């Protein structure tokens, strides 16, 4: 009899403790020792958690790399107007990084800390991003009309002040909510009877959306402010306005979809379990919109010089002084080389080799035309004075029996001067150029 009673008690234990077995049952992909709070991070049956954290992890890495690139490109930014926006853009990247991190708080099951972080950081992080867009749009409206905008610290201060407004709103809302209900929440997120509708996890979906009205106002301001930038006089700033406009249009579409789903769709289909996936997907989608349509295009444009700087670079190119430059200038001067085959003998002192660097003083050299004797002879009498025209050779200027039979330029010049001093009989000066190597 005792054996039968013991057997019945062992078989009846599972019937009396079904809750204990249910608590030890872990979803596929999760360890039995894992806290049930983190089951969505590894649950393969509901893949939305794994996909969301994978997308958020890739976004965190991408945003971190883009932040490093933007900060490292600061010394290479030549346009001072773009450099003044770097502080605001880094602030925008920090807000985007926070949105990717907040995705994990939405994947984890509701708890007092996770619910409080969602309620507070959701609006603050979006306010950071949209405030930076509003400040950028404000600067672009000045740049497209005057090609000169506010200082960098002014733009950053505008973005910071707009963000502080949302910080104050969320802080007051969260404090009032917690103090009024005492914040009594069970470890698994089950709200006690004394704190119903007063804890962060017990806030209605409609109330959560209503607390984001200021953030929606910032988004609408950035969207409307981006349109005038497309009509400015300075067209090179229009593409930045297009980046902001495209980002805000997609963000508005994302916000409309998730708000409708969060406040109306889930209640109509009686699926409150889709509240967390809705927030996680909205965060990841909007953060990637910021990265793809605003951050990456702005980073690619930040180091490009302004048209004024490009024009100055073309007008005043950098020119180095070196051996190659001297050779090019000497080559340019060699186009007027004297033909030595038809030149007369010159004194030996004139034939000394001259260094190509003797006349170089560090400045740009110019080619100087030095005509030869043959060129002067072919110019004619009307182009120069009579005393520079080379004389013709005569039989009286040189003794045929001398040892040196070469005509010297000095003797020819003396004979020619004598002939010029004796005018012709008709009283006119006539210049007859004869071959100096043919005797009269």
From Swiss-Prot:
Mark the residues carrying the PTM Phosphoserine. Answer: 343, 382, 402, 405
Q: What does the protein in this record do? A: This retinoic acid-inducible G-protein coupled receptor provide evidence for a possible interaction between retinoid and G-protein signaling pathways.
Q: Ranges in the Cytoplasmic compartment?
A: 71-84, 141-155, 229-240, 300-440
Q: Kindly report the protein's main subcellular placement as a broad class.
A: membrane
InterPro entries, per this entry?
Bride_of_7less, GPCR_3_C, RA-inducible_GPCR3
Q: Name one GO molecular function term.
A: sevenless binding
| UniProt name for this protein | G-protein coupled receptor family C group 5 member C
**Phylogenetic classification of the source organism:** Eukaryota, Metazoa, Chordata, Craniata, Vertebrata
Q: Does the keyword Transport apply?
A: no
Q: Which UniProt keywords apply?
A: Cell membrane, G-protein coupled receptor, Glycoprotein, Membrane, Phosphoprotein, Receptor, Signal, Transducer, Transmembrane, Transmembrane helix
């Amino acid at each position: 009899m005792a054996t039968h009673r013991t057997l019945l008690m062992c078989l009846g234990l599972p019937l009396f403790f079904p809750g204990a077995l249910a608590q030890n049952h872990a979803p596929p992909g999760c360890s039995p020792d894992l806290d049930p709070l983190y089951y969505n991070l590894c649950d393969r049956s509901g893949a939305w958690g794994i996909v969301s954290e994978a997308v958020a992890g890739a976004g965190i890495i991408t945003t971190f790399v883009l932040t490093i690139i933007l900060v490292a490109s600061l010394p290479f930014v030549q346009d001072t107007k773009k450099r003044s926006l770097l502080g605001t853009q880094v602030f925008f990247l920090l807000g985007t990084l926070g949105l990717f991190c907040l995705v994990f708080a939405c994947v984890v099951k509701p708890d007092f800390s996770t619910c409080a972080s969602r309620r507070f950081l959701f609006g603050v992080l979006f306010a950071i991003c949209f405030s930076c867009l509003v400040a950028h749009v404000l600067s672009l409206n000045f740049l497209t009309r005057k090609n000169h905008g506010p200082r960098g610290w002014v733009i950053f201060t505008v973005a910071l002040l707009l963000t502080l407004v949302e910080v104050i709103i969320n802080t007051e809302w969260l404090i009032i909510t917690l103090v009024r209900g005492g914040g009594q929440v069970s470890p698994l997120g089950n709200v006690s009877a004394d704190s119903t509708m007063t804890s962060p996890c017990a806030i209605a979906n409609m109330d959560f959306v209503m607390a984001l009205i200021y953030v929606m106002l910032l988004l609408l301001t950035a969207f409307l402010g981006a349109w005038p930038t497309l009509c400015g006089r300075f067209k090179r700033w229009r593409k930045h306005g297009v980046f902001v406009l495209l980002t805000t249009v997609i963000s508005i579409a994302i916000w409309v979809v998730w708000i409708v789903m969060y406040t109306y769709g889930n209640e109509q289909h009686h699926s409150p379990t889709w509240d967390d996936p809705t927030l996680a997907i909205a965060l990841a989608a909007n953060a990637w919109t910021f990265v793809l349509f605003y951050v990456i295009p702005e980073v690619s444009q930040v180091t490009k010089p302004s048209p004024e700087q490009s024009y100055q670079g073309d007008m005043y190119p950098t020119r180095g002084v070196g051996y190659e430059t001297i050779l090019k200038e000497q080559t340019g001067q060699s186009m007027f080389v004297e033909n030595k085959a038809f030149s007369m003998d010159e004194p030996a002192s004139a034939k000394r080799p001259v260094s190509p660097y003797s006349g170089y003083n560090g400045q740009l050299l110019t080619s100087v035309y030095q005509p030869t004797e043959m060129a002067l002879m072919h110019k004619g009498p009307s182009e120069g004075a009579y005393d520079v025209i080379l004389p013709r050779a005569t039989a009286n200027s040189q003794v045929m029996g001398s040892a040196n039979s070469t005509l010297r330029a000095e003797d020819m010049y003396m004979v020619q001067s004598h002939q010029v001093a004796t005018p012709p009989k008709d009283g006119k000066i006539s210049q007859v150029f004869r071959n100096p190597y043919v005797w009269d």
